[in-house]
Each structure stands twice: as C-alpha cells, then as structure tokens.
C-alpha cells in the first residue's frame, strides 16, 4: 500500500516528484494527455507537502502559477489555501499552496 504524501519525509517526496516527472515526460512524448494532466496534478500536490503552510497568510494575495490570476487567501487547511481569485470573487475555491507565488 502506498503512503500518503502527508506521511512521507521530504526525501521520499522528492523521490516521488522525480519519479512522477519522469512518467509525465514519457506520457507527454507518447501524447497521452489525460495521463499527463493526472501526473502534473500529483506533482503539484507532492510539492505542496514540501512547503510550510505557515509561510502563507490569510488576507494576502498571491499570483497563481502559470496564469495571470491572483488569489486572496481566506484561510488555510493543511496544504490547501481556501479563498477567491480576483477574476471570480464570488466563488470560493481551494488551491494547493505549491501553485501560489509571491506577487511581483
């Protein structure tokens, strides 16, 4: 039985990320788009567990990785930041903290 990311050590997480990245590269080479999307999401989640949620603050606004969107955190629950994108302030959503970047 596989371990949950929350139960893995940083070394195990880095090993898992490397393994998933290799699988994602192969899926992309073979044009398996669905598999690539799943693997990229797993990589994002594993990276979130390498970060410290205490480095992210409710009320702060961050840029969402690979988009032009900004995201304001309402609260944190584990490695997920709950809040609102500036483009859709009525719709609350949760994002892994690994996709949040400091605004420039």
Curated annotation (Swiss-Prot):
A family per Pfam: DUF1811
Top-rank taxon, per record: Bacteria
Alphabetized SUPFAM superfamilies for the sequence: Hypothetical protein YfhH
Oligomer and partners: Homodimer.
Listed name of the protein: Uncharacterized protein YfhH
Annotated source species: Bacillus subtilis (strain 168)
Gene name as annotated: yfhH
